[in-house]
A protein has these predicted regions:
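Conserved acetyl-CoA-binding loop-helix of GNAT-fold acetyltransferases
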Residues: 23, 31-46, 65-70
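Conserved donor-binding loop and adjoining core beta-sheet/short helix segment
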Residues: 7-16
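C-terminal "cap" of GNAT-fold acetyltransferases
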Residues: 19, 78-91
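Conserved acetyl-CoA-binding loop of GNAT-fold acetyltransferases
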Residues: 69-79
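A short, internal acetyl-CoA/4′-phosphopantetheine-binding micro-motif in the GNAT/acyltransferase core
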Residues: 15, 20-32, 58
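Conserved GNAT acetyl-CoA-binding A-motif
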Residues: 48-57
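Short, small-residue-biased leader/transition segments that mark boundaries at the very start
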Residues: 1-6
Length: 91
């Protein structure tokens, strides 16, 4: 199940128009496409809800930033020490 791969999935309100999405993978599952899969699933959920999708990561999380950019998220700046990437997908 998902618990075998993910320590945690993140999906909650970020602001009135957006949902923050993310994941924490168990190290044995890094670099195997699971973060891409979760990004696709959660982005589709945000889109169905008519919301934008946001990924926040600390600057050292270069893999997360790469995934955000690869999935079409745009860098918006830094908030509370995290880089903020947003994908506009509201209806």
């Amino acid at each position: 199940g998902l618990g075998d791969v993910y320590k945690r999935q993140i999906y909650h309100d970020y602001d009135e128009y957006s949902r923050e999405l993310g994941w924490v993978l168990k190290p044995a599952f890094w670099h195997k496409g699971y973060a891409d899969e979760m990004t696709d699933l959660l982005t589709a959920l945000a889109r169905r809800e008519g919301k934008n999708a946001v990924i926040e990561c600390v600057p050292e999380q270069t893999a997360s930033a790469h995934i955000a950019r690869r999935h079409g998220f745009s860098y918006e700046g830094r908030a509370d020490g995290c880089d903020v990437y947003r994908l506009r997908c509201e209806k």
